[in-house]
Structure formats: C-alpha cells, structure tokens
Design a protein with these regions (language model features):
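A short, hydrophobic C-terminal helix/tail in secreted or cell-surface proteins
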Residues: 192-210
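Bacterial N-terminal signal peptides that target proteins for export
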Residues: 2-12
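C-terminal membrane-anchoring or membrane-association module
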Residues: 208-219
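Cleavable N-terminal signal peptides
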Residues: 16, 26-27
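Sec-dependent N-terminal signal peptides
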Residues: 11-17, 202-203
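A recurrent domain-boundary module in secreted/ectodomain proteins
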Residues: 168-190
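Activation on beta-sandwich/Ig-like modules and their edge loops
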Residues: 27-155, 162, 169-171
C-alpha cells in the first residue's frame, strides 16, 4: 500500500541566517531514507538513493553496496564523497551519461545500477554497516537487510522511510512504497533543527517570557 509524506526542503539561505557552521562528523546517525532502483522506462539518469543524517557529516569513507539476493555477493560498490547539507538530506543519483542526472536535488552523481528485488542495498563505512535495506521476496534467497524485507516497489515507485528519524531495525515496518518518488525531501517533522538556530529560538523565547512578566508587573 502506498502512503504519502508531507515534505519540505529547507533552502540554504534560511540555514545561513542562523549562522550555522558545518563541520565533519561521524557517520553513525546516517541512514538510507529513500531508494528508487527501478525507474519507469530507462533507469539511466533516473534512479537514486537518498541518505538522511546529521548536517555537516562528511561522507568520505562511506560506500553503498548492492547485494545480490540469489547468492549474497556484492555486485556493486559506490564510494561516496561530499558533506550532508543543512537539511540533513543527501541524494546519490545516477549519471545520465554526461556527468549530470535527471534526478531532482542530486548531491552526488555516480554510475548506479541497483538490481530489482530480491536484493539489498547496504550503507557502510570502515567501522561496519551503518544501515541496510532489503526488498522483495527472499524465499530461498540471501537477505542482507534489517529484520523483514520491504516490498519490491513497482517500476517508477520508490521505497521511503515513513520517518527518517525512526529506525526500528525492520525494513518492512520502516519503509513504505511511494508512487511519486521524493528525492531530496523529508517529512516536515523530521527536518533537523541546527543547534545555532535552536539556541537562537530558545533565547528569543526567554526574552519574550521576561517581557511578558515585566508587562504584567507594570499593569
């Protein structure tokens, strides 16, 4: 069953107003948040894997792997690079053949060809597996995802986390089929609040509270 997500992508200008300074961080909180591995028509330049993580996290040393569901072998390895932007969303998109991609909001363009299910996509760094998504019917196959497999999305549809902040360790529970893929967007409730902005808003709230108390005393 397909479900809709209420989505938002924060412009960099908004984050800039908060005086945010991004610095490289660890990879532990980075997860696979959406994957379109079978586009309607040609896959060339149209498929993607979206990651969600802490803004400012450097992805050097992180890779995506395609795991064959028939024998568990690694058939594709994609070394990643770049830094997760201020909205926490990083889109790894397929190369259309000229160094560009047809995927919206692409942050990194690579030659990508993930197979249809049953297969798995694994996100890892030097320390081990960060996240994994298995999709399709693994009866008699090798499952490299988490918990129970997500369904095999039909052509043109993606698999997406209903909430990128929630990782129960079960692909079937965490992922849903989206009829309309949403690369570069996440549910509004999941947009991370930069620390500087959170501090600013907290301070403003305190000032307003003091002003109200003083106004009450003056009456």
């Amino acid at each position: 069953m397909s479900r809709e997500r209420t989505l938002i992508r924060l412009p960099a200008a908004v984050l800039g107003l908060a005086g945010v300074v991004m610095t490289p961080g660890v990879h532990a909180a980075t997860v696979i948040s959406e994957a379109l591995y079978d586009a309607a028509g040609t896959d060339n330049g149209n498929v993607f894997v979206e990651l969600y993580g802490t803004p400012g996290t450097a992805l050097d040393g992180v890779s995506l792997e395609g795991i064959n569901g028939s024998d568990g072998s690694v058939y594709l390895t994609l070394p990643l690079s770049g830094v997760i932007p201020g909205d926490g969303v990083f889109v790894v998109a397929d190369d259309a053949g000229d160094g560009s991609s047809l995927v919206d909001n692409a942050d990194l363009v690579v030659n990508m060809d993930f197979q249809n299910g049953p297969d798995s996509i694994v996100l890892r760094d030097a320390a081990g597996i960060l996240d994994a998504l298995g999709y399709g019917d693994f009866s008699g196959g090798v499952f490299a995802g988490e918990g129970n497999a997500a369904p095999d999305a039909p052509a043109g549809s993606s698999l997406a986390r209903a909430d990128p902040l929630a990782d129960s360790g079960d692909n079937l529970s965490d992922f849903t089929v989206l009829d309309t893929p949403t690369p570069g967007s996440v549910p509004v409730s999941s947009v991370p609040l930069p620390p500087a902005l959170a501090l600013f808003l907290s301070g403003m709230g305190g000032l307003l509270a003091v002003s109200r108390r003083r106004a009450g005393l003056a009456v």
